[in-house]
Amino acid sequence: VEEKEKVRLKTLLKGGRHEVTSRLDVPLYKRDGYKIPEDEVLLKNQNKVYLGNSLYHNIRYTYQYRNRLFWGFTAEKDAGEPFGSYGNKAYDAYSFHFLLKDCGKLKALALGDYRLGFGEGLVVNSDFSLGKSTLFNMGDTRPSIKKFSSTSETSFFRGIAAAFRFGRVDMSAFYSYLPTDATLRKDGTISSLKTDGLHRTLLELSKKHNVTEQSVGTD
């Protein structure tokens, strides 16, 4: 096994690359949902009237030192979502990630938002995809902990995950606490999960973070 070179803490924190990116989408047409209604109309058409403007905007900050240290945050507002109102603190969705890799016996430590792959993805896999390398990677049973920096509001864990190596033995553990959108029945049970991440109308906002997914595991 190739040992990673030792890196001083100061180099890890200051020797990497900072990057800030932003995206703004300005539509050239206007949907009926953006027309400003009276309060009575808004209440009667809770799923037809958008509460925010028609702009889409996100901003990202990332820091990376080689393949050893990553951190950053993402903030996003979808078109039609309110900005700084209706319970939103400015943007509708926020994400933070921190990932440290190959630090002695600690192979990976993730804080904030992350993705997992255990048991070739048959046990846990929040990072599944099909591609040219899928068959070549099937023999790799080592657990994977990856940073999550996407604007997607689903298919990730939020909390802490760590992987250690003691000789030829790998050990991993994780805990996640993730608020999730859902449609609830009158008795409080879940009717369905909402996975599109959109909170543009009163009805969509009423489904925001109604339930919490807690996950814990070891490998």
Give the location of each predicted region.
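Outer-membrane beta-barrel channel domains
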Residues: 1-219
